[in-house]
Amino acid sequence: MPQVTMRQMLEAGVHFGHQTRYRHPKMSPNIFGARGKIHIINLEKTVPLFNDAMNFLSAVAQKRGSVLFVGTKRSARDAIKEEAERCGMPYMIQRWLGGTLTNFRTVKQSVARLKELELAETDGTFSKLVKHEVLRLRRESGKLQASLGGIKDMNRIPDAIFVIDIGHEDIAIKEAKKLGIPVVAVVDTNYDPSLVDYPIPGNDDAIRAVQLYARAAADAVLEGKAAMPNAAAVREEEFASAPDAGKKGRQAQPKKGKRASDAAAE
């Protein structure tokens, strides 16, 4: 599991919450106190919850599952894109499209259109079209790339989603909950941690904090992938654990023209 220390969290500003007047009552157990009018998050509570969340992501990846990284706010986009690409997972960094999960079949049609346009640009199709038509198709491709480029290779519903700001990504979380998809999310002092399966109490605005979360999530995924059982090893293990009768194979059949009793006597 990726090791992130309390000191690293302090240096990244994970402990700084929102203004005290915005406190959500259910976040109170995770709040240490206040400095001025800003709540201070208790990192002694954050660290074990953070570790639980990372262990879960690692377990998902180990079972060949996919994790959708979600961070559409400006402070999260770069880190989410970079780390999701590093660990080979899909991501969403532009405005969340309603129905991305709950209407995935339609989204896949839009993704197919994006791939079609990308192919047309590389295989010479565009060179056969008039200029204004090429410009129109490139604009269409650009819009699709901006909104769906991160999930272009996501062929099925993800096994989990990793979210930076549950208030900003409330639609994504509602869709995930509707489909029973586990949610790992950073939850600041102004939101309800019970809305997600694996809450991580922490600052959801500071760029350094977001980078820490995203990097740790990617490391957890890569660790899980590295621990995936080798397919050949699994087959060998299954064969070795088969009943002895299965190993012996079929009994020899009597040769043609001989009675079964004669064959047995031989």
From Swiss-Prot:
Protein name (record): Small ribosomal subunit protein uS2
Lineage of producing organism: Bacteria, Pseudomonadati, Pseudomonadota, Gammaproteobacteria, Lysobacterales
Family membership: Belongs to the universal ribosomal protein uS2 family.
The species this protein was found in: Xylella fastidiosa (strain Temecula1 / ATCC 700964)
Entry superkingdom: Bacteria
Presence of the UniProt keyword Repeat in the record: no
Gene3D superfamilies linked to this entry: Glucose-6-phosphate isomerase like protein, domain 1, Helix hairpin bin
Xref: InterPro entries: Ribosomal_uS2 (IPR001865), Ribosomal_uS2_bac/mit/plastid (IPR005706), Ribosomal_uS2_CS (IPR018130), Ribosomal_uS2_flav_dom_sf (IPR023591)
Gene: rpsB
SUPFAM superfamilies reported for this sequence: Ribosomal protein S2
One protein family per Pfam: Ribosomal_S2
CDD domains, alphabetized: RPS2
Any one Gene Ontology BP term: translation
NCBIfam families (UniProt xref): rpsB_bact (TIGR01011)
GO MF term list: structural constituent of ribosome
Entry annotated with the keyword Lyase: no
HAMAP family: Ribosomal_uS2_B
Location of the region described as Disordered in the Swiss-Prot/TrEMBL record: 233-266
GO cellular component: cytosolic small ribosomal subunit
Keywords of this entry: Ribonucleoprotein, Ribosomal protein
Basic residues biased stretches: 248-258
